[in-house]
């Protein structure tokens, strides 16, 4: 009898993968074959640059449906950046035996609960990489696209003590779907839980009570695969964890697109949101200019902004690239003029802000 996640995966994965095809490119990754328990039956790929920083950071990268680890790396340019910044990369990879569309099973109860299935396999890989390369345990991060983004949310929820930060691209919040019908509805942006329930889902996933990982959210304003309402739900989920309100501390235009920042009560930046208004479903990349990294392809979308470089900069493990085109110095002040007004107008025009 096939696993429940197999059946669910065929349906949910097909929707997520309708237009997605594997991004091909040079395979710079190696296999990690002995990392301990693997209840999720995942493959582990890794990249270790020739020049490592002392006690390097570790970045875990989770591909989207129909993609491979090597294809995602080629498109997003993570190993390119690792060569410069000296951090280690771990790319868990789905197997077709688990999911015919190569989606991580973010919606299957047996794969999204701590200590079980795919999340447990990824956790074991992280431990093995940390031991093998002397990774700084305070600088472990995770990011992913689409189903990989939703699995990123699951990793952050189940193992918050492991991660300093996460970045979710075109993904969904944790704990909103348990089965095929719910997964499809959430992807359409329907019946998402309220902020309190979203936050409670993360708090209930572990015994952790803080500090919480920081979060970078990226979403296309015209994403027809995972509705942008999921980005707002993610923000609600994590603002609740940090105990901060809806109003951002700062707003800016980056590449003509809204960028919002939230700070905790100590003034530390803990959440950011990049909304690429004219972009559909995929990972934002730049193929030219100072922040060029990776290569364009299916669901590797050249919008002139490298999410890879900017996420790494947000985490503090790579050089900051570029600068905001304009910034509202005090987002708590006048909301209708200047950059803050432009950002809000842009979000409203895209139907992303009431």
Where are the language model's segments positioned?
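Short glycine-enriched nucleophile-adjacent loop
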Residues: 149-161, 167
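Cap/lid segment of the alpha/beta-hydrolase catalytic domain
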Residues: 93-117, 179-180
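Alpha/beta-hydrolase active-site loop
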Residues: 110-133, 154
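Short beta-strand immediately N-terminal to the catalytic nucleophile in serine-hydrolase-like folds
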Residues: 142-144, 169, 218
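A domain-start/cap signature at the N-terminus of enzymes
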Residues: 1-58, 70-76, 84, 114, ...
């Amino acid at each position: 009898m096939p696993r429940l996640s197999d059946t669910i995966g065929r349906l949910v994965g097909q929707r997520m993968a309708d237009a997605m095809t594997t991004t091909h490119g040079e395979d710079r990754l190696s296999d990690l074959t002995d990392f301990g328990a693997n209840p999720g039956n995942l493959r582990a790929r890794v990249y270790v640059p020739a020049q490592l920083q002392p006690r390097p950071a570790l970045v875990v990268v989770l591909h989207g449906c129909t993609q491979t680890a090597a294809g995602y790396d080629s498109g997003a340019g993570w190993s390119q950046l690792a060569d410069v910044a000296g951090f280690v990369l771990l790319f868990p990879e789905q197997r077709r035996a688990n999911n015919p569309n190569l989606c991580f099973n973010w919606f299957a109860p047996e794969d999204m609960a701590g200590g079980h299935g795919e999340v447990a396999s990824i956790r074991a890989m992280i431990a093995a990489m940390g031991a093998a390369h002397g990774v700084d345990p305070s600088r472990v991060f995770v990011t992913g696209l689409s189903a990989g983004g939703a699995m990123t949310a699951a990793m952050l929820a189940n193992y918050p003590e492991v991660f300093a930060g996460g970045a979710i691209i075109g993904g969904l919040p944790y704990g909103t779907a348990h089965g095929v019908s719910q997964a499809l509805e959430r992807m359409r942006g329907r019946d998402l839980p309220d902020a309190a329930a979203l936050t409670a889902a993360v708090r209930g996933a572990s015994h952790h009570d803080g500090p919480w990982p920081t979060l970078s959210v990226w979403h296309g304003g015209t994403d027809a695969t995972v509705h942008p309402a999921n980005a707002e739900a993610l923000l609600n989920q994590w603002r609740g964890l940090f105990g901060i309100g809806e109003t951002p501390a700062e707003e800016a235009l980056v590449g003509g697109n809204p960028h919002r920042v939230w700070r905790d009560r100590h003034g530390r930046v803990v959440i950011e949101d990049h909304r690429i208004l004219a972009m559909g479903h995929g990972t934002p990349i730049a193929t030219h200019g100072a922040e060029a990294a990776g290569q364009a392809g299916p669901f590797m979308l050249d919008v002139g902004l490298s999410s890879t470089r900017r996420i790494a900069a947000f985490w503090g493990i790579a050089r900051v690239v570029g600068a905001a085109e304009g910034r509202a110095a005090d987002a708590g002040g006048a909301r209708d003029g200047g950059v803050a007004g432009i950002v809000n107008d842009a979000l409203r025009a895209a139907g992303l802000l009431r």
